[in-house]
Amino acid sequence: MSLTRLHIETFRNITSAQLLPGEGINLIYGHNGSGKTSILEAIYFLGMGRSFRSHLSQRVIQHSDDKLTLFANLNVLDKESKIGLRRFRSGETEVKIDGDKVKRLSTLAESLPIQVITPESFALLFEGPKSRRQFIDWGAFHCDKSFHSAWVNVKRILKQRNQLLKNETSYSQIQFWDKELVRYSEVVTDIRTRYVNSLNEQLKGIIGEFLPLVDVKVSFTRGWDSKTDYAQLLEMQYPRDLASGNTGSGPHKADLRLRVGTLPVQDALSRGQLKLLVCALRIAQGKLLKQQIDKNSIYLVDDLPAELDAKHRQLLLQQLIDTGAQVFVTAIEPAAILDSLITPPSKTFHVEHGRVTVIE
């Protein structure tokens, strides 16, 4: 899978731009504030319906306009597909895939699997469990079609259950919701567990390349004791949940744990090593996606020279090339990337004041 054409309108400081990306590495360079990261953000927005830089989508629309427009041509297994998105300042979103209107953003995400490696993505190991659940669920969503609906149902039931707890509802009235919660939680947990097990197999060789002589163990915690029946646990914890007004255990508390020996990786590894570990995790996800559903991710790598030294830049870029994925990588100076590549990028773009120029 790859983008063969990308059109951006009134997105951040880009009034209008059209790119014809190539396979493999696409280098985008320019000074800070030029708009190079906005190109990556636009691709992400097209695939996810939101930004990786701001939770307020209206902020990416140019002040002089009331909407942004993004569309792209995709090459998917030698077949062309078209996707388009329009976001209005009012919050309304219009999405089309091959000319047909799409109501759910999950359909958009399924069409364009995107991996992001930015300075902020390294927070995966430092933030709370939510970001690591999202990491697992990206893969679970793309690799198993039954995951999304099951997880949507879990979140819907949890919302209802928590409201009943806040209303001090008796357990006999909550039991119906608990049966449904257990049913969907088992589906979600089974898919997550199988996905993490498969991811572990992919990770072994990749971590060895990035962190030789470091033995990183990855394990999945489901959000409650695996030896305890979830239905019994919900009943047992009802008094505590009633007091707090929230469901204390379940798949919404799941986490991905990474350790070196008995220590969390945050305590055992240097900051530089942790960055390499996150890169390894992202590459493993891309390789697993290709293995399981024969679809490549699109990688967005922002400000790579600022995050890794020359040796590890070269290693990361080569690993990305080996995945067969299309990659968009930004830098202030092109030499920082060009010097790390054995062969030139398939396309090079220069960005200045929101204007994009192809470098032949």
Swiss-Prot record:
Localisation: Cytoplasm
Principal subcellular localisation of the protein: cytoplasm
Keyword DNA repair on entry: yes
Gene3D superfamilies (UniProt xref): P-loop containing nucleotide triphosphate hydrolases, RecF/RecN/SMC, N-terminal domain
Record Pfam families: SMC_N
Record's keyword terms, sorted: ATP-binding, Cytoplasm, DNA damage, DNA repair, DNA replication, DNA-binding, Nucleotide-binding, SOS response
Binding site for ATP: 30-37
GO cellular component term of the entry, any: cytoplasm
Signal peptide positions (record): none
Keyword Transport annotated: no
Taxonomy, superkingdom: Bacteria
Gene Ontology MF terms: ATP binding; single-stranded DNA binding
GO terms (BP aspect): DNA replication; DNA synthesis involved in DNA repair; double-strand break repair; SOS response
Entry's family note: Belongs to the RecF family.
NCBIfam families hit by this protein: recf (TIGR00611)
Function as written in the Swiss-Prot or TrEMBL entry: The RecF protein is involved in DNA metabolism; it is required for DNA replication and normal SOS inducibility. RecF binds preferentially to single-stranded, linear DNA. It also seems to bind ATP.
Protein name: DNA replication and repair protein RecF
